[in-house]
Amino acid sequence: MAISKEDILEAVGSMTVMELNDLVKAFEEKFGVSAASMAVAAPGAGAAAAPVEEKTEFDVILLAAGEKKVEAIKVVRAATGLGLKEAKDLVDGAPKAVKEGISKADAEAIKKQLEDAGAKVEIK
């Protein structure tokens, strides 16, 4: 029996950020495509307008662990693959970069998870 779109969406919705990253890489390899978004050329206002470069890599910065420090450590471990001690040191040493050079979608997902855990986070 074929898998429905709803089944696929349900499975993807329950994945962690790291699992989603692995899935995207698998799609890129299997189908020979790239997940990078293509820049769309807007109608030009003339040659005088300089092209604006869109930022493609983002850093997630943990500003403060908040009240639920243990939850923040769990999220940092899941997002980075660090061990317990390394994740605790990162959270205790805030402000620090949790993850650097990642896509905006991944950065937003990690930021949301950390904020849900009570941490203060920014994306640069």
From Swiss-Prot:
**Domain of life per record:** Bacteria
Q: Does the keyword Lipid biosynthesis apply?
A: no
Which UniProt keywords are given for this protein, alphabetically ordered? Ribonucleoprotein, Ribosomal protein
Entry's Gene Ontology cellular component terms: cytosolic large ribosomal subunit
Q: What are the recorded GO MF terms, alphabetically?
A: mRNA binding; structural constituent of ribosome
Query: Which InterPro entries does this UniProt record tie to the protein?
Result: Ribosomal_bL12, Ribosomal_bL12_C, Ribosomal_bL12_C/ClpS-like, Ribosomal_bL12_oligo, Ribosomal_bL12_oligo_N_sf
| One of the protein's GO biological processes | translation
Q: Which residues form a coiled coil?
A: none
The record's SUPFAM superfamilies line, in alphabetical order, gives: ClpS-like, Ribosomal protein L7/12, oligomerisation (N-terminal) domain
Where in the chain are disulfide-linked cysteines found?
Answer: none
One Pfam family assigned to this protein is: Ribosomal_L12
- Function, in words: Forms part of the ribosomal stalk which helps the ribosome interact with GTP-bound translation factors. Is thus essential for accurate translation.
Identify its protein family: Belongs to the bacterial ribosomal protein bL12 family.
Q: Assembly state and interactors? A: Homodimer. Part of the ribosomal stalk of the 50S ribosomal subunit. Forms a multimeric L10(L12)X complex, where L10 forms an elongated spine to which 2 to 4 L12 dimers bind in a sequential fashion. Binds GTP-bound translation factors.
The protein in question is named: Large ribosomal subunit protein bL12
Whose protein is this, by species?
A: Aromatoleum aromaticum (strain DSM 19018 / LMG 30748 / EbN1) (Azoarcus sp. (strain EbN1))
